[in-house]
Amino acid sequence: AVAYPETTEEVSQILKICHAQECPVVAYGAASSLEGQHLAVAGGISLDMSRMARVLSLDAEDLKVTVQPGITRKSLNEELRATGLFFSVDPGADASVGGMAATRASGTTAVRYGTMRENVLALEAVMADGTIIRAGSDARKSSTGYDLAHLLIGSEGTLGIITELTLKLHGVPETIAAATCRFPSVEDAVNCVILTIQSGIPMARIELV
């Protein structure tokens, strides 16, 4: 069966019922996974998060945005276009941000902006028994309490279903230039990348083709 929740409370109610009936639940985002994490191989309930795809709040001055998990990376950046800000993690596919957090997505921009782990400030999640928790902090500088947010990031739905995320934003660069370089060996290419990063040049992406 497929369930289409629209709020955190609905996710909580679904998980409470499934927990009581010992029914498996698999979260379903944008189905962009190449590894099949969204497949309900043991049956049960497929929890389709596509109807939870809203931007809940935007704080451009503090460079952060709070969203529901079903919004995709491209849709989020379209919403942010007028602000001059963007969400930096780019795994290639147009994944949902909830799925990106659940799988600790990375991508070609990680060399400059980091992975999903570094770009989630706080989150809300529903545990298997329906309990709703909040983890992390909206503040950039915080050392209070257990770091449960980073425990949930990359847990692939095994610890809970992410229902809300507060994400870091970055300014869109004024200019972007791309170049292709040839090297006599892979070792030479790697050494060039190391020296480039050590020199402090703000590289957004570095790929080996």
What spans do the regions from the language model cover?
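Glycine-rich N-terminal segment of FAD-binding domains in flavoprotein oxidoreductases
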Residues: A1-M52, P69, F87
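FAD-binding subdomain of flavoenzyme oxidoreductases
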Residues: R54-E61, V65-E207
